[in-house]
């Protein structure tokens, strides 16, 4: 794979390529119009459209016009800012990137689920710099971004979003799904759980 600065990187080369190289950052965006095939002109490259490192973030399509990018990264090998609490909206129609409401906790390798009443819950992840796990999920009303993110304090769990015995990494991309009864069902490593939507 050839990077935008001309460097060539091999796929699946392991730790020797991970440690210390400069591509642990997701700061450039390539928007591809797949309807027009695989030609170079079907891609539009945006170099640093906003100050957000989206490496290890989560991306969700909100509607036909907006894509939501949540959580970010702090590349320890660069001078890039710490954007682990950042969120961003990509406007498909206008092809514009705009920073959105910040998360309360750092969510490197976090996960999200969208509820039936148009809310987004983010859970898991950690602060990459300090290795402090984000054990309290937080919620955003997608109909009212201005209210910002709120903690779901009753859902706080070291067991489900921490790192039991420093071996299981439950914080690492816990999987979550919206069940037919409106509750959130999740998997944290080898643990299955349910979040009651009727109780904050």
Residue ranges and their predicted role:
Residues 1-200:
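Kelch-like beta-propeller repeat domains
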């Amino acid at each position: 794979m050839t990077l935008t600065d001309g460097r060539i990187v091999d796929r699946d080369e392991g730790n020797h390529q991970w440690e210390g190289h400069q591509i642990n950052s997701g700061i450039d965006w390539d928007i591809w119009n797949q309807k027009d095939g695989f030609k170079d002109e079907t891609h539009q490259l945006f170099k640093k459209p906003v100050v957000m490192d989206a490496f290890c973030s989560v991306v969700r399509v909100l509607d036909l016009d907006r894509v939501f990018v949540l959580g970010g990264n702090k590349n320890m090998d660069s001078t890039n800012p710490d954007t682990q609490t950042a969120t961003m909206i990509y406007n498909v129609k206008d092809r514009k990137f705009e920073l959105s409401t910040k998360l309360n906790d750092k969510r490197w390798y976090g996960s999200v689920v969208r509820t039936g009443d148009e809310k987004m819950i983010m859970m898991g992840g950690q602060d990459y710099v300090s290795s402090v796990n984000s054990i309290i999920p937080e919620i955003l009303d997608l109909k009212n971004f201005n209210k910002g993110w709120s903690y779901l304090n009753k859902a706080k769990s070291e067991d489900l979003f921490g790192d039991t015995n420093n071996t299981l990494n439950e914080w690492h991309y816990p999987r979550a799904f919206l069940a037919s009864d409106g509750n959130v069902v999740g998997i944290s490593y080898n643990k299955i759980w349910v979040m009651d939507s009727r109780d904050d």
